[in-house]
Design a protein with these regions (language model features):
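Contiguous beta-strand segments within globular domains
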Residues: 43-93
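Bacterial Sec-dependent N-terminal signal peptides
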Residues: 1-31
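Short acidic/polar inter-strand loop motif in beta-rich domains
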Residues: 96-98, 142, 156-163
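Extended, solvent-exposed segments with strong compositional bias
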Residues: 109-131
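Short structured motifs
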Residues: 58-62, 116-121, 134-138
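Extended low-complexity, serine/threonine- and proline-enriched intrinsically disordered segments
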Residues: 83-112
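Sec-dependent signal peptide cleavage junction
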Residues: 23-47, 51
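Ligand-binding face of N-terminal immunoglobulin V-set domains in extracellular IgSF glycoproteins
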Residues: 129-155
């Protein structure tokens, strides 16, 4: 029996946290003290709207993956600030109370827990200028190997000290 089938019934639940984070892979180094004590499904930047986390191709799905599978989730959101920004992300394992787990990254992620949101599309023929962002994750260089709750933390790479 392969790992894919052995873990197929252990769900992984995600919430979106638009918060700042530590991101060593892309030259951004922030203190762990900046992370919230408890992750919440909140938006901290007034320009961010229409946040959706779902299974690709299924608009009303829950943000749940099977541990050990190569399934992905799709994150979409709009930035109404009018400027294209560079966003990064980090994935954290959380306990049942959505507090950051004490486990080291290597025990719950194989590969890199950080990345960059590369897909951005400018609006056209609209009253307001905005950019739509899209991320499919986990990416090729990341595999979630532990079942549990995960927080997807999004931050602005240009100004990582400000909450997005």
């Amino acid at each position: 029996m392969t790992n894919r089938f052995r873990f197929s019934y252990l769900p992984i639940l995600f919430i979106i946290v638009t918060e700042i984070t530590t991101n060593f892979a892309f030259g951004l180094t922030l203190s762990e003290e900046i992370l919230p004590d408890t992750f919440k499904n909140e938006i901290y930047d007034a320009g961010i709207h229409t946040v959706l986390l779902k299974t690709p191709g299924w608009e009303f799905s829950l943000p749940v993956l099977d541990a050990g599978s190569r399934d992905q989730l799709e994150l979409r959101f709009d930035d109404l600030s009018g400027n294209q920004r560079n966003f990064g992300y980090t994935i954290y394992l959380c306990n049942a109370g959505w507090e950051k787990s004490e486990l080291p990254e290597q025990e719950y992620i194989s590969g890199f827990p950080t990345g960059v949101i590369r897909e951005a599309r400018a609006s056209f023929n609209t009253t307001y200028d905005y950019f739509s962002y899209r991320l499919l994750f986990p990416e090729e260089n990341c595999e979630l190997i532990q079942s549990g709750n995960y927080a997807l933390v999004i931050f602005d790479q240009e100004n990582p000290d400000n909450i997005v």
